[in-house]
């Protein structure tokens, strides 16, 4: 009996490498402007999640295209940054100075933009994600629609994790930006770091952008992932984080 059990376990170990697989989620942010790069992002191999700006010119069409291609769509919700110098500000962008009525209208209109959406992430938002009342409204509206929240972590002082826990909203946070430095050498290093983190903790989240160099890189790399790394949608990683109480 013991020998039979041992052989069964050994067979599983030998023939089921996925038993020990680690999870990696890759998100392509800022879709909605370039139709060509948007479609290239969606056409990347595997379970890539695409974050689409709600009111960009090609946002609705790209969301529909992503659904046809069996990709996961999230709403990339524009939020106020601490500094908007030399940065393009989307219109409309949630702003801490807005009236409650204006804020609510923009929030609800944005979150209703794509019926296909599974989640919400913050576009910019280094200021707003630190503010209690604005984030409570965002997370409440997110939860009411059955969506998860991906924190892009544009601020190390983001309170999204704690507020999501209190609102019982599924939550996950970015671990790495792939292309803040756009060289292939840097992107290879980021991918390697993500593999290491995934093997250590069980998962990792990378955010990239629809730059030509990034897409060229991912088209190659995603076809040659290590055998112990599983590419997954962000929704497969989200949790109602029980450890978030009292955390910033």
Model-derived segments and spans:
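Bacterial N-terminal signal peptides that target proteins for export
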Residues: 1-6
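N-terminal signal peptide c-region/cleavage motif recognized by signal peptidases
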Residues: 15-16
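Active-site beta->alpha N-cap acidic-glycine motif
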Residues: 21-87
């Amino acid at each position: 009996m013991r020998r039979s059990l041992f052989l069964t376990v050994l067979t599983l170990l030998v023939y089921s490498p996925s038993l020990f697989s680690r999870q990696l989620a890759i998100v392509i942010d800022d879709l909605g402007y370039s139709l060509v790069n948007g479609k290239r992002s969606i056409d990347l191999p595997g379970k890539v999640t695409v974050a689409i700006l709600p009111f960009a010119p090609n946002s609705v069409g790209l969301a529909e295209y992503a659904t046809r291609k069996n990709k996961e769509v999230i709403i990339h919700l524009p939020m106020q940054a601490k500094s908007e110098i030399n940065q393009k500000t989307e219109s409309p962008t949630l702003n801490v100075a807005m009236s409650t009525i204006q804020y609510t209208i923009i929030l609800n209109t944005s979150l209703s933009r794509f019926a296909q959406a599974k989640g919400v992430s913050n576009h910019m938002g280094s200021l707003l994600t630190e503010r209690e009342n604005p984030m409570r409204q965002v997370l409440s509206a997110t939860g009411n629609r059955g969506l998860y929240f991906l924190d892009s972590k544009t601020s190390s002082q983001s309170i999204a994790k704690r507020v999501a826990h209190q609102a019982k909203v599924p939550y996950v946070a970015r671990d790495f930006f792939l292309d803040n430095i756009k060289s292939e050498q840097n992107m290879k290093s980021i991918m390697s770091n993500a593999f290491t983190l995934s093997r250590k903790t069980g998962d990792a989240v990378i955010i990239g952008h629809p730059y030509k160099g990034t897409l060229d890189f991912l088209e190659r790399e995603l076809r040659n992932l290590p055998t112990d790394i599983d590419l997954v949608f962000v929704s497969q990683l989200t949790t109602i984080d029980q450890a978030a109480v009292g955390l910033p």
